């Protein structure tokens, strides 16, 4: 919703369903009931072109999609001849410990949206899909002014050559171990009264700021962002209530640099508890 503000009229109709995840308390059953209501009240299932899912929500707070729901949705799409599209722009290329995050869901999408890591920071996006779908497009029928930029494509090829599964697994596992162990240390020490849950998977992690009653603490997150910025660490918020810190470092970050960033974050969390009380 925050990204729709001041954008103007959006193409439609587009419908949204609850995102079932262990990180937000929405169950698979609740999401499936919402889908049943959607097709009973809002739209005829025969008018649906596709479902778009994020295996791990990015702006939503690094929430992991429920496996049971993903598989039920895949079966539903197969039964109704609806395309299933996986948005892997943030989660793709090893962020979650696997080349693509949808792998952990036990499904295969019809189309995959890629970007960000695909070219090592050079602007490039891509759509990957089943041959039977993409071969239906006429040559040159899908493009844009800057499509096929040769420098960006060369950067992507070099990046993909470097991104072997072995490298991705090692890089992702190292980051995950560092982040999870540090978070667990903070929890055991009760570092901050606002330290909430750790969301996400692999090296794609979010740290929730919450009040004592479990409610989101977006004001404290705003304070934390300022403290971190003054200490030389740039952080970004996420989540519906903008109360979750995104940890999304380059997979190639040196271990010492990652630890330095976590050290700064630790100090800022301590200061946050002092200035907010």
PLM features per residue range, with description:
Residues 1-277:
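Conserved N-terminal phosphate-binding loop of PLP-dependent enzymes in the Aspartate aminotransferase
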